[in-house]
Amino acid sequence: MTINSLDAQKPFTTADGSTIRSILDRTNAPVEKQSLAEATLPAGGATERHYHKLSEEFYFVLEGTAVMEIDGEEKNVSPGDGILIPAGAWHQITAKSEGLRILCCCAPPYSHDDTYFE
């Protein structure tokens, strides 16, 4: 059994610019097919627009509000919203006036090498 505490995970900045604490991934658990992380953005902050060739992502908004853009379509998101980002879809999330905290699940697991920019 593997149980990892969020508080024990060291934050790092991903290629898209968000601050991540990886809860379960290949670096800290016997994970093969997915990863789970907390991502944060400061008020007004945004990820760089990007896509992943291999990974499908789920975002789940924990705190804050944001504008989610996927392949040119924009929607407002808030706590309790789940977002599907298909593999190959261009996407960007922009925090509104307060900071943003989300859970992010990637399958296959997140990799810097699978992040592509405009």
Predicted feature locations:
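Conserved short histidine dyad/triad with adjacent acidic residue
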Residues: 37-52
